[in-house]
Amino acid sequence: MLARMSDWTPPELPVSAGAILLDEQGRLLILKPTYKSGWTVPGGVMEADGESPWDACRREVLEETGLEVDEGRLVVVDTRPGKDGAKLGLRLLFHCGTVTARAARRIRLQEEEISEHRFAPVDEALELLRKPVRRRVAAGLEAEHATYLENGRPAPGIR
């Protein structure tokens, strides 16, 4: 069971958390969702029941792949502008390290949401990822510390 932050109140804006997971050859785990086009990384929207972004990341990885993530570091904080009356969204990306070959063999997909998965060389994976995810993942792979982005791009005045 994942720990909950009992005094955490989710913000009014939608928050999602994703995971960068690499295999022992340095290839990126990517997933093909059933409900939208293109490829993405494990992750999803934070629950409104007091879940923290890190808990959301861990839960989504477990639900979508069956993998348990115990460690990670925040590498990207990104804002996405709302479209057609939608609210501004906040996207967080955690680098969750390496998936062993043994763990990779145990991946079990959440079939109603994920149709397939693969570990792809980073350059190939970045080409396959949906554009907003691609920019976040590229920044996250290069980040030595957390990086703040606005719509997938470095914000003016932020270093």
Q: What is the role of each PLM region?
A:
Residues 46-70, 80-132:
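Unchanged
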Residues 37-39, 111-159:
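Nudix hydrolase/Nudix homology domain
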Residues 20-22, 75:
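Conserved positions in beta-strands of structured domains
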